[in-house]
Amino acid sequence: MRLATDLETPRRVAVLSVHTSPLAQPGTGDAGGMNVYVLQTALQLARRGVEVEVFTRATSSADAPVVPVAPGVLVRNVVAGPFEGLDKNDLPTQLCAFTAGVLRAEATHEPGYYDVVHSHYWLSGQVGWLARDRWAVPLVHTAHTLAAVKNAALAAGDAPEPPLRAVGEQQVVDEADRLIVNTEVEAQQLVSLHNADRSRIDVVHPGVDLDVFTPGSRDAARAVFGLPTDQKIVAFVGRIQPLKAPDILLRAAAKLPGVRVLIAGGPSGSGLAQPDTLVRLADELGISDRVTFLPPQSREQLVNVYRAADLVAVPSYSESFGLVAVEAQACGTPVVAAAVGGLPVAVADGVSGALVDGHDIGDWADTISEVLDREPAALSRASAEHAAQFSWAHTVDALLASYSRAMSDYRARHPRPAARRSGRRFSMRRGVRT
């Protein structure tokens, strides 16, 4: 048996995030949990002495080519296609240009500069596949979501994922040296839907910043947004799109007189076509006087959103994990979530909140009411205790183990001279070779 101590730790990792930048504001456009994941894991890796370069597509002429984020972490904005107006479904046409930008950046380093390529989402996997072959290093891939899973649980008005994506995902699954998933459910989906080799899959739970997302004064948090202190508040945080199902919360709230709804997020995906849909729905349901809409919030303000709420609802039709659920619980706020994907892991049913099977409005209203009636102090403590197990430090422990396995297995299959890893070390802190 190979011991963990026998495994090699990478010096540098090239992280690919084609369609969305880790520096983008979550809750806007295509920015969401994946952005948080990429940024937080990069920061944690750097704290362990692993240098990280994140490659993402530039979306503005104002984007600097290289952005130092923290010691050991760089974001490279690669020019590939028009800066604005390019839909995510059109990005496959720009993968050649993006790949060229990535390879050119690597060519400025000495051979063997990166030890691992980690791609996020299938678009990045296509680029990572080529980079892996060019650089002779292992490819680790995180899908985050799968087309087949999303298409099997489409919400009304949501657009199905294109066949091109399903084909691309299969190619990446076949080519990746290791596959990282959020939960065992996702691992089984890769096996059943894409015939993935289970021995190449590592389950790595995402985390939460337990130094930022902490319990605090509910009244003080409500004062930040001018919210009343004498009403029960149920919050929704995330992108406004059919997949996330914020309409389910509004319809359930219509059956719960006295409950106020707080929605924080911006339109995304199919929701971009009708950004005012929820506002109109609240009017139609006659609850517009007890619904507050907020734009996407910074992390610091998001903490106040969670603290202000008595409960956070996550009614998604599909969710590979559910970072919002864990962030809310870390703030001591219980969660009512759909029993889909990774949410049964993110939420401890009956302990830190409740899970709802399906999207029947009556079931959602009843479950929200039942959780709101529980003893709040005990529920808040249980929520924070459950979230405490999901730290980014734990995530990176598992991530490093996966990287090490990928490197060891790759070297066993593709021996190369030790000189490949030699050469001058590059300091991302100063941007020069040393």
From Swiss-Prot:
InterPro entries: Glyco_trans_1, Glyco_trans_4-like_N, Mycothiol_biosynthesis_MshA
GO molecular function: acetylglucosaminyltransferase activity; D-inositol-3-phosphate glycosyltransferase activity; magnesium ion binding
Disordered, as annotated region: 414-434
SUPFAM superfamilies: UDP-Glycosyltransferase/glycogen phosphorylase (SSF53756)
Enzyme type, top EC level: transferase
Catalyzed reactions per annotation: 1D-myo-inositol 3-phosphate + UDP-N-acetyl-alpha-D-glucosamine = 1D-myo-inositol 2-acetamido-2-deoxy-alpha-D-glucopyranoside 3-phosphate + UDP + H(+)
Any Pfam family the entry gives: Glyco_trans_4_4
GO biological process assignments: mycothiol biosynthetic process
Key words of the record: Glycosyltransferase, Magnesium, Metal-binding, Transferase
Annotated Mg(2+) binding sites: Y306, R307, A309, T333
Superkingdom of origin: Bacteria
EC numbers: 2.4.1.250
Chain sites annotated for binding 1D-myo-inositol 3-phosphate: H19, D30, A31, G32, G33, M34, N35, K88, Y121, T145, R165
UniProt family annotation: Belongs to the glycosyltransferase group 1 family. MshA subfamily.
Subunit structure: Homodimer.
NCBIfam families: mycothiol_MshA (TIGR03449)
Function of the molecule: Catalyzes the transfer of a N-acetyl-glucosamine moiety to 1D-myo-inositol 3-phosphate to produce 1D-myo-inositol 2-acetamido-2-deoxy-glucopyranoside 3-phosphate in the mycothiol biosynthesis pathway.
Identification of the protein by name: D-inositol 3-phosphate glycosyltransferase
Gene expressing this chain: mshA
